[in-house]
Structures are given as C-alpha cells and as structure tokens.
Design a protein with these regions (language model features):
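Fold-independent oxyanion-binding glycine-rich loops
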Residues: 13-17, 52, 103
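Positively charged, low-complexity intrinsically disordered leader regions
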Residues: 1-45
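Conserved active-site and cofactor/substrate-binding residues in soluble primary-metabolism enzymes
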Residues: 26-30, 56, 88
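Small/polar-residue-rich loop-to-helix segments that shape phosphate-bearing ligand pockets
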Residues: 78-106
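Short active-site-adjacent helix-start/loop capping segments
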Residues: 21, 55-60, 81-85
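Conserved beta-strand segments of alpha/beta enzyme cores
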Residues: 9-11, 71, 99-100
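A short, small-residue-rich loop immediately preceding and capping a beta-strand
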Residues: 43-62, 68-77
Length: 106
C-alpha cells in the first residue's frame, strides 16, 4: 500500500468545469479557439466541419464559432440507423445555430 504523505499541494484541472454548459467539454474547445480567432482575423466568416463519426467535435466547433461571431457549417452524415447518442449531439449543435448540411453516409 502506498503511504499518504501530508503537506503537499496538489492542483487538479477539471476539464469538465472549464467551459460551463451549454458548452461542450473543454477537451473539444481548447485547441480550436485560437485557430478560429486567427481565421477570423484573416476575414473568414464561415467555418465548415465534416462530422465523420459520433463525436463531440461538431458540438465544439458550433460552440466556438458562436462565441467568436463566426458561422459554423456542419456537414452531418445521415446513417440508416441513427444512434441515440448522435441524436443527442445534434440537439447540442442546434443550440448554437449552425448551418447543418445533411450528407449521404456510406
């Protein structure tokens, strides 16, 4: 058994608290913010993202664009059977008012 040592300050970073709801988890936002700021400085107004699987990345892109005054365009694959988790993610996207473009999934 590992002994417990006292008098050590341990700092813990909670990614789940860095961006409060309705934002997605921090891990989906931390890298994209600076990238989108640079695109905005370059005059970009629309940011496209193609969702390739069931992930939170589209949610992160939509949130970050809304925060920065950009317009997200999410290309959304349409599957024969839509898993419940994907329905949940799509609902999360919509609260940030992206343009959602359905695309045929293979």
């Amino acid at each position: 058994m590992t002994p417990i040592e006292e008098h050590y300050n341990v700092l813990v970073k909670r990614d789940d608290l860095c961006f409060p709801p309705p934002a997605p988890p921090f891990s989906k936002c931390r890298g994209i913010i600076e990238h989108l700021r640079r695109l905005k400085r370059e005059g970009i107004e629309y940011v496209g993202y193609t969702e390739t699987s069931i992930s939170m990345a589209g949610w992160g892109v939509a949130w970050a664009c809304k925060e920065l005054g950009l317009k997200a365009v999410l290309f959304d694959p349409q599957y024969k059977q839509t898993p419940e988790v994907l329905k949940y993610h799509r609902q999360q996207w919509k609260q940030f008012d992206p343009i959602i473009v359905p695309i045929q999934a293979g």
